Amino acid sequence: MKTIEVDDELYHYIASRTQAIGESASDILRRLLRLPSSPQPFVLVQPNIAEELNASTKSTNQAKKQTNIEKTVQKFERVLKSDTFVNETKNVRRFLMLLSALHISDQQGFANATAVVTGTERTYFATNEDMLLRCGNGVKAKKIPDSPFWVVTNNSTARKGLILTAVMQSMQMPSHLIDRVRVLFA
């Protein structure tokens, strides 16, 4: 609370506007000036400074997002270049390795992507096998290594590629990597 001095005439005017016993001078003035009942923080910011602050915040957030994507790309490329991946002949295992790499590199992004990527009549991802098995007869589900997710694996090689590229697009992976995966599962 701050103390201010007012002349007698103003004091009597404010006092005459009292509506309830115990109402403070601040409450009366707020009501008379049509201000909110609770004090609001007041900061004087010049418009161009506010715009600069907003721009710097946006650029910082974009830089962090870009750094996370770069880390994801590096981890994913490491898997693509690894001897284990290159020498693997079974597409199902390659499919699972790449999904695992995506999950390890960006768990939240992967979780968001799996929630979005679905087929017209089939769910491709779930957090347990039973959820996938309920989606239809003949569904083969496998656990994605090092993740809590399961994926349907009895799809054609081309469909596996579509699933992978859809997840990668949802995770905002660069188009050159998406194209590279598309070629692997063509």
Curated annotation (Swiss-Prot):
The subunit structure is:
Homodimer. Polymerizes to form helical filaments.
- GO:BP terms for this protein? negative regulation of DNA-templated DNA replication initiation; regulation of DNA-templated transcription
User: Lineage in the entry?
Assistant: Bacteria, Pseudomonadati, Pseudomonadota, Gammaproteobacteria, Pasteurellales
Mitochondrion found in the keyword field: no
Q: Which family does it belong to?
A: Belongs to the SeqA family.
Q: Name one Pfam family in it.
A: SeqA
Localization per Swiss-Prot or TrEMBL: Cytoplasm
Superkingdom: Bacteria
Q: Which GO terms describe its molecular function?
A: DNA binding
Task: Cite the InterPro entries for this sequence.
Answer: Arc_rbn_hlx_hlx (IPR013321), Ribbon_hlx_hlx (IPR010985), SeqA (IPR005621), SeqA_DNA-bd_C (IPR026577), SeqA_DNA-bd_C_sf (IPR036835), SeqA_N (IPR033761)
What is the annotated role of this protein in its UniProt record?
Negative regulator of replication initiation, which contributes to regulation of DNA replication and ensures that replication initiation occurs exactly once per chromosome per cell cycle. Binds to pairs of hemimethylated GATC sequences in the oriC region, thus preventing assembly of replication proteins and re-initiation at newly replicated origins. Repression is relieved when the region becomes fully methylated.
Q: Tell me the protein's name.
A: Negative modulator of initiation of replication
Q: Name one GO cellular component term.
A: cytoplasm
Disulphides: none
Has keyword Cytoplasm?
A: yes
The alphabetized UniProt keywords are: Cytoplasm, DNA replication inhibitor, DNA-binding
**HAMAP family from the UniProt entry:** SeqA
